[in-house]
Amino acid sequence: MIRIGHGFDVHAFGGEGPIIIGGVAIPYEKGLVAHSDGDVALHALTDALLGAMALGDIGKLFPDTDIQYKGADSRRLLRTAYQAILDKGYQVGNVDITIIAQAPKMRPYIDAMRTVIAQDLHCDIEQVNVKATTTEKLGFTGRSEGIACEAVALLIKQTGTK
């Protein structure tokens, strides 16, 4: 059996950088406004994984009203959510992430993001795709007011599990 989930996240720029996207620190003059570390890619991916298993969303599992998640490392949140997936007998088939930002440019960091995500999901790097695009200067991302991200996850039932 397979399951598919979709996730979306957005954060506005504010304060000072660097920013963390896909688990990778990216030098930038602005930071991201967030309760946790503001990693839109890992937040969208976490939502996609949780959605695929009908486990709600990142806000349900890690509420922003809970002080323990203030400034939280999104890699830790992703690993915790993924453990819930493994506990239900599923594993990653593949994930596909689209980062939407006018700036900063993501291309130099994409391979590192793929490596980090593959490590956290205990899968091969070939099962992780990360890409970036702009909105051609349209909307809030086009005006460099923030970053958005979408993610899709395909989960596969592990063999030998019920």
Curated annotation (Swiss-Prot):
GO terms for biological process: isopentenyl diphosphate biosynthetic process, methylerythritol 4-phosphate pathway; terpenoid biosynthetic process. Pathway: Isoprenoid biosynthesis; isopentenyl diphosphate biosynthesis via DXP pathway; isopentenyl diphosphate from 1-deoxy-D-xylulose 5-phosphate: step 4/6. A divalent metal cation binds at residues 9, 11, 43. It catalyses: 4-CDP-2-C-methyl-D-erythritol 2-phosphate = 2-C-methyl-D-erythritol 2,4-cyclic diphosphate + CMP. Binds 1 divalent metal cation per subunit. CDD domains: MECDP_synthase. It is an enzyme of class 4 (lyase). It comes from the Bacteria. The record marks 35, 134 as: Transition state stabilizer. Keywords: Isoprene biosynthesis, Lyase, Metal-binding. Pfam families: YgbB. Its cofactor is a divalent metal cation. The keyword Magnesium does not apply. 4-CDP-2-C-methyl-D-erythritol 2-phosphate binds at residues 9-11, 35-36, 57-59, 62-66, 133-136, 140, 143. Its EC number is 4.6.1.12. Involved in the biosynthesis of isopentenyl diphosphate (IPP) and dimethylallyl diphosphate (DMAPP), two major building blocks of isoprenoid compounds. Catalyzes the conversion of 4-diphosphocytidyl-2-C-methyl-D-erythritol 2-phosphate (CDP-ME2P) to 2-C-methyl-D-erythritol 2,4-cyclodiphosphate (ME-CPP) with a corresponding release of cytidine 5-monophosphate (CMP). HAMAP family: IspF (MF_00107). Homotrimer. Belongs to the IspF family. This is 2-C-methyl-D-erythritol 2,4-cyclodiphosphate synthase. The gene is ispF.
